[in-house]
Protein backbone atom coordinates (compact mmCIF):
# COMPACT_ATOMS: atom_id res chain seq x y z
CA UNK A 1 0.00 0.00 0.00
CA UNK A 2 1.27 3.46 -0.87
CA UNK A 3 -0.25 6.77 0.17
CA UNK A 4 1.19 8.46 -2.90
CA UNK A 5 -0.82 11.69 -2.95
CA UNK A 6 2.15 13.63 -1.55
CA UNK A 7 4.18 12.49 -4.56
CA UNK A 8 1.78 14.49 -6.73
CA UNK A 9 1.81 17.59 -4.53
CA UNK A 10 -1.62 16.80 -3.07
CA UNK A 11 -3.02 16.01 0.34
CA UNK A 12 -4.86 12.70 0.75
CA UNK A 13 -8.05 11.95 -1.14
CA UNK A 14 -11.11 9.71 -0.77
CA UNK A 15 -11.08 10.14 3.02
CA UNK A 16 -7.72 8.35 3.21
CA UNK A 17 -6.42 10.64 5.98
CA UNK A 18 -9.65 10.22 7.95
CA UNK A 19 -9.56 6.45 7.68
CA UNK A 20 -5.82 6.13 8.34
CA UNK A 21 -6.06 8.25 11.49
CA UNK A 22 -8.67 5.88 12.87
CA UNK A 23 -6.80 2.72 11.89
CA UNK A 24 -3.23 3.58 12.90
CA UNK A 25 -3.51 6.81 14.90
CA UNK A 26 -2.74 10.38 13.86
CA UNK A 27 1.06 10.19 14.20
CA UNK A 28 1.50 7.08 12.03
CA UNK A 29 -1.11 8.37 9.55
CA UNK A 30 0.75 11.65 9.25
CA UNK A 31 4.05 9.85 8.63
CA UNK A 32 2.48 7.59 5.99
CA UNK A 33 0.79 10.50 4.23
CA UNK A 34 3.87 12.74 4.31
CA UNK A 35 6.46 10.18 3.15
CA UNK A 36 4.48 8.28 0.52
CA UNK A 37 6.40 5.13 1.54
CA UNK A 38 5.25 1.67 0.40
CA UNK A 39 3.96 -0.82 2.99
CA UNK A 40 4.03 -4.55 2.29
CA UNK A 41 1.28 -6.93 3.38
CA UNK A 42 2.94 -7.97 6.64
CA UNK A 43 3.48 -4.32 7.62
CA UNK A 44 -0.16 -3.57 6.82
CA UNK A 45 -1.38 -6.34 9.13
CA UNK A 46 1.00 -5.26 11.93
CA UNK A 47 -0.13 -1.63 11.75
CA UNK A 48 -3.84 -2.43 11.49
CA UNK A 49 -4.29 -1.51 7.83
CA UNK A 50 -5.24 -5.07 6.90
CA UNK A 51 -6.84 -7.85 8.92
CA UNK A 52 -5.89 -10.95 6.94
CA UNK A 53 -2.68 -11.82 5.13
CA UNK A 54 -2.83 -14.62 2.58
CA UNK A 55 0.22 -16.78 2.03
CA UNK A 56 1.84 -16.58 -1.39
CA UNK A 57 -0.28 -18.45 -3.92
CA UNK A 58 -3.19 -18.87 -1.49
CA UNK A 59 -5.19 -15.70 -2.03
CA UNK A 60 -8.25 -17.44 -3.50
CA UNK A 61 -8.17 -20.20 -0.87
CA UNK A 62 -7.89 -17.68 1.98
CA UNK A 63 -10.63 -15.50 0.51
CA UNK A 64 -13.06 -18.38 0.02
CA UNK A 65 -12.41 -19.68 3.55
CA UNK A 66 -13.20 -16.28 5.05
CA UNK A 67 -16.27 -15.88 2.82
CA UNK A 68 -17.56 -19.31 3.91
CA UNK A 69 -17.04 -18.43 7.57
CA UNK A 70 -18.94 -15.16 7.17
CA UNK A 71 -21.72 -16.79 5.14
CA UNK A 72 -22.35 -19.26 7.97
CA UNK A 73 -23.16 -16.41 10.39
CA UNK A 74 -26.31 -14.30 10.75
CA UNK A 75 -26.64 -11.78 7.92
CA UNK A 76 -29.06 -9.78 10.09
CA UNK A 77 -26.42 -9.47 12.82
CA UNK A 78 -23.78 -8.61 10.22
CA UNK A 79 -25.97 -5.84 8.79
CA UNK A 80 -26.60 -4.36 12.24
CA UNK A 81 -22.92 -4.48 13.16
CA UNK A 82 -21.90 -2.81 9.90
CA UNK A 83 -24.53 -0.09 10.36
CA UNK A 84 -23.41 0.67 13.91
CA UNK A 85 -19.72 0.67 13.06
CA UNK A 86 -20.23 2.99 10.10
CA UNK A 87 -22.56 5.29 12.04
CA UNK A 88 -20.29 5.77 15.05
CA UNK A 89 -16.84 5.22 13.62
CA UNK A 90 -17.33 7.27 10.46
CA UNK A 91 -19.98 9.65 11.79
CA UNK A 92 -18.30 12.90 10.80
CA UNK A 93 -16.83 11.68 7.52
CA UNK A 94 -19.16 13.86 5.45
CA UNK A 95 -17.76 17.07 6.95
CA UNK A 96 -14.23 15.71 6.60
CA UNK A 97 -14.85 14.90 2.91
CA UNK A 98 -15.96 18.49 2.26
CA UNK A 99 -12.89 19.90 4.01
CA UNK A 100 -10.66 17.44 2.17
CA UNK A 101 -12.15 18.45 -1.18
CA UNK A 102 -11.41 22.10 -0.46
CA UNK A 103 -7.79 21.25 0.46
CA UNK A 104 -7.29 19.16 -2.69
CA UNK A 105 -8.73 21.94 -4.84
CA UNK A 106 -6.31 24.40 -3.21
CA UNK A 107 -3.38 21.96 -3.65
CA UNK A 108 -4.19 21.50 -7.34
CA UNK A 109 -3.73 25.23 -7.94
CA UNK A 110 -0.21 25.26 -6.46
CA UNK A 111 3.14 25.06 -8.29
CA UNK A 112 3.93 21.76 -6.53
CA UNK A 113 1.03 20.01 -8.25
CA UNK A 114 2.01 21.42 -11.66
CA UNK A 115 5.59 20.27 -11.08
CA UNK A 116 4.41 16.78 -10.05
CA UNK A 117 2.25 16.41 -13.16
CA UNK A 118 5.03 17.65 -15.45
CA UNK A 119 7.55 15.33 -13.78
CA UNK A 120 5.18 12.39 -14.24
CA UNK A 121 4.68 13.18 -17.94
CA UNK A 122 8.42 13.69 -18.42
CA UNK A 123 9.22 10.49 -16.45
CA UNK A 124 11.41 12.18 -13.87
CA UNK A 125 11.31 12.88 -10.15
CA UNK A 126 9.61 16.15 -9.21
CA UNK A 127 11.67 19.00 -7.78
CA UNK A 128 9.59 21.08 -5.39
CA UNK A 129 10.65 24.69 -4.86
CA UNK A 130 7.74 25.93 -2.78
CA UNK A 131 8.61 26.58 0.87
Map each language-model feature to its residues:
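Low-complexity, intrinsically disordered Gly/Pro/Thr-rich segments
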Residues: 104, 115-117
